[in-house]
Amino acid sequence: IRGENGQKMSESKGNIIDPIDLIYGISLEDLLEKRTSNLMQEGLAEKIARKTKKQFPNGIESYGTDALRMTFYSIATNAKDISFEIGRLKGFRNFCTKMWNAARFINGYENKGNNFEAESESDKWILKEFEQLKADVEDNVNHYRLDLAINHVYEFFWNKFCDVYIEECKKTEKTDNLHPLLKEILIFIHPFAPFITEEIHSIIFKAPLIDR
């Protein structure tokens, strides 16, 4: 695994990042302590401290488990070297925020407990896109290309479901299909982002998703 500057992550370079720190965050002081303690080559401590302060002047932010999980999926390519970038992690944290915002918007409408009924052209379009997503992801997973699978999930949810379909529902004020479609999407995305999908489902549908 290589860091943002392309260098291989190693203790001697002082560029190893503990996944726990990416999930919960860590202060600069604690990060320096972690990176410079118990080094096999104590003379590297000062150099490592300088690099750490430059890269993380305010420590490491909290990104959450699902954002990190999806980031790891996205870099699971067939390449010999894997590059880990904080910017990519931020992108998936934003994706989680997008999921929250979409769910909050949909929760503002009454859940009539109905099934999805493809009446309008936009209904038919999003249903077709969702079926295509399922086929693409199944093929990706069968070929061990989780990077492609998570990219398809990201593209569908952000660009198609949120930016196109939800916006169309706002314009037409036809929102009956939002709840049943969101439910199916949460179930589908659950293996990639289990914590946020479980919580959203529990809040909106008043039932645990994991039982499905």
Predicted regions and their residues:
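Helix-rich, typically C-terminal accessory recognition domains appended to large enzymatic cores
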Residues: 59-212
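Conserved phosphate-binding loops in nucleotide/dinucleotide-binding enzymes
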Residues: 1-65, 79-92, 143, 147
